[in-house]
Design a protein with these regions (language model features):
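Extracytoplasmic ligand-binding site segments that recognize negatively charged/polar headgroups
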Residues: 3, 52-204
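Early extracytoplasmic/lumenal segment of secretory-pathway proteins
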Residues: 1-54
């Protein structure tokens, strides 16, 4: 899709876009330390708290975003529907808005200045092969089910992987977190301990 975006930018704006593929940590490092090395940064929501306060990024005027009204509530107020529960962790809406074009502090509500536009809904966290399993998978606890020993894996982006691990531990009834996005040291140690033992047992 990125090649198509570059081609459309060339057609509509007359500019040639050069894409650079980087891993998540390298993106954070580049945005923080090399602001003149890029014009547009494709960052993820969890990165915002790390890089936005540095002041190397500029917010977008929502009045110039043609389809702003079509951006779902998850990114504006944290809710997909009026009765939705707001997510733990870095819920997108908590880092979606700042006070002005050059604002460094996040706003708790829409301000007309947006940090990021959602372009991709990732489905990379949990991959299931129903054609091989032949039964429903409806709980995160299945990730540590011995049935899948040697066939399971977790995401190697630590800020996301730790949240997946927490959902597994909670689903197993091993830990009840106060806030998975702001764990205590005890919660972190217990979570890592459970997965370390699973790794030693050959689950991953």
């Amino acid at each position: 899709a990125f090649n198509e975006i570059a081609a459309k930018a060339k057609e509509d704006l007359g500019i040639t876009m050069e894409m650079t593929a980087l891993d998540s940590d390298s993106v954070v490092q580049k945005v923080a330390t090399q602001p003149k090395a890029f014009d547009i940064a494709d960052i993820e929501y969890w990165m915002c708290k790390k890089v936005w306060p540095i002041g190397n990024l500029q917010a977008m005027d929502t009045s110039k975003i043609a389809n702003y009204d079509k951006i779902v509530g998850i990114f504006k107020n944290g809710k997909l529907t009026p009765t939705s529960t707001i997510a733990q962790g870095t819920a997108p809406h908590t880092v979606s808005f700042v006070e002005g074009a050059n604002g460094k502090s996040f706003s708790s509500e829409e301000t007309g200045w947006m940090t990021m536009i959602p372009t991709i809904y990732n489905a990379d966290t949990l991959g299931i092969r129903p054609d091989l399993i032949n039964r429903p998978i409806n709980t995160w606890a299945e990730l540590l089910n011995p049935e899948f020993k040697g066939k399971a894996s977790i995401l190697d982006i630590s800020s996301i992987g730790i949240m997946d691990m927490a959902m597994v531990c909670e689903a197993m009834g091993e830990i009840q977190y106060g806030d998975k996005g702001n764990m205590t040291k005890e919660e972190i140690d217990k979570t890592i301990g459970i997965f370390t033992e699973a790794k030693k047992a050959g689950q991953f």
